[in-house]
Swiss-Prot record:
Pathway membership: Carbohydrate degradation; glycolysis; pyruvate from D-glyceraldehyde 3-phosphate: step 2/5
One of the GO BP terms on file: gluconeogenesis
Protein name as annotated: Phosphoglycerate kinase
Catalytic function, reaction form: (2R)-3-phosphoglycerate + ATP = (2R)-3-phospho-glyceroyl phosphate + ADP
UniProt binding sites for ATP: K197, E314, G340, G341, D342, T343
GO molecular function: ADP binding; ATP binding; phosphoglycerate kinase activity
Homology family: Belongs to the phosphoglycerate kinase family.
């Protein structure tokens, strides 16, 4: 994958527009989870160190296009950036006709989704973005799967279009995990439905040695293998699909599970062998025997890709399976990559972030890359690099 990289460019005195993913949760006008902002800081700092006049843009939420809405304003993000960078980061609302930014200064543009034509990737808007800068830097992996004005269109028209350090690191880590993975490779794919992760399961079944499934997905595979799953969430119409995937790759199934009579934080948890699951049981986690077996598989892997917790870890009594696997991934010598919102929450809960080789910031983009789909914002950077 050949793209121009911001790190290789001379930015002294250049106007640089950086597209970051600053779509963070805001509560009462204050940023409530700052992971994405923290991830963007090294790129912004590097551009400033290189002597650029820096303009940062992002979307936040899903406002009605073309209309300002206070709840989707990036003002809280501008306030956060000012503190984090130790300098004033003004929020600029009217920027499409040009902005006065001096070398060594940084401004944040108001939500790009307030601009008509952003979602539709309108050429006219993209050309306005491009006219603002000498160099466009795409650094938002989390929105790279969307062809929008500020992620794709601007890269077509900017004088120079490059990948930022965060985007470049994501592509390198995913390329390493999927392109030429160290063997053996184990993937964990968990979630409520096979149908939503079908392309991921199919794609990984072609490159993995072991495909560990969890959550409702595991229940569908268990039912497909003839096991009773009680009143657990599963997809009866996808049993043949599960069997077809299991015929292509080793899918180790749970031998014991943690069940409850109801889905609730107060529900009593009972460990049962899979053969003993009753008609009124709900499977909400893998059992200790299964967790220990899966942990051994992970510890002997060369590459691990983790997408999704294997149980309802939000409730502690159904979190031991995910905790055991998280600790095993942390202790493994494998190159490990993790992605997806629930996965990141589990990593935080069990304190293993430092021991995972790479944590992807992109949810949908992460999955689409794993599925083997082309990410439009990356494709346009490749095309520009060839030209």
């Amino acid at each position: 994958m050949t793209v121009l990289k911001m790190t290789d460019l001379d930015l002294q005195g250049k106007r640089v527009l950086i597209r970051e993913d600053l779509n963070v949760p805001v509560k009462d006008g204050v940023v409530s989870s700052d992971a994405r902002i923290l991830a963007s800081l090294p790129t912004i700092r590097l551009a400033l160190e290189k002597g650029a006049a820096v303009m940062v843009c992002s979307h936040l939420g899903r406002p009605t296009e073309g209309e300002f809405s206070a709840e989707n304003s990036l003002k809280p993000v501008a306030d956060y950036l000012s503190k984090a960078l130790g300098r004033d980061v003004p929020l600029v609302a009217d920027y499409l006709d040009g902005v006065d930014v001096k070398a060594g200064e940084v401004v944040l543009f108001e939500n790009v989704r307030f601009n008509k034509g952003e979602k539709k990737n309108a050429d006219e808007l993209a050309q306005q973005y491009a006219a603002l800068c000498d160099v466009f830097v795409m650094d938002a992996f989390g929105t790279a799967h969307r062809a929008e004005g500020s992620t794709h269109g601007v890269a077509k028209f900017a004088k120079v279009a490059a990948a930022g350090p965060l985007l470049a690191a994501e592509l390198e880590a995913l390329g390493k995990a999927l392109g030429a993975p160290a063997q053996p490779m184990t993937a964990i794919v968990a979630g409520s439905k096979v149908s939503t992760k079908l392309d991921v399961l199919n794609s990984l079944s072609g490159i993995c040695n072991q495909l560990i499934v969890g959550g409702g997905i595991a229940n569908t595979f268990l039912a497909a293998a003839g096991h009773k799953v009680g009143k657990s969430l599963y997809e009866p119409d996808l049993l043949d699909t599960a069997r077809a995937i299991a015929a292509k790759v080793s899918v180790p199934l749970p031998t014991d599970v943690v069940v409850a009579k109801e889905f609730a934080e107060s529900a009593a948890a009972t460990v049962k062998l899979i053969a003993d699951v009753a008609d009124d049981d709900m499977i909400l986690d893998i059992g200790p025997q299964t967790a220990a077996h899966f942990a051994e598989l992970l510890k002997s892997s060369g590459t691990i890709l983790w997408n999704g917790p294997v149980g309802v870890f939000e409730f502690d009594q159904f979190g031991e399976g995910t905790k055991t696997l998280a600790k095993a991934i942390a202790e493994s010598q494998a190159f490990s990559i993790a992605g997806g919102g629930d996965t990141l929450a589990a990593i935080d809960k069990y304190g293993v972030a430092q021991q995972i080789s790479y944590i992807s910031t992109g949810g949908g983009a992460f999955l689409e890359f794993v599925e083997g789909k082309v990410l439009p914002a990356v494709e346009v950077l490749e095309q520009r690099a060839k030209a």
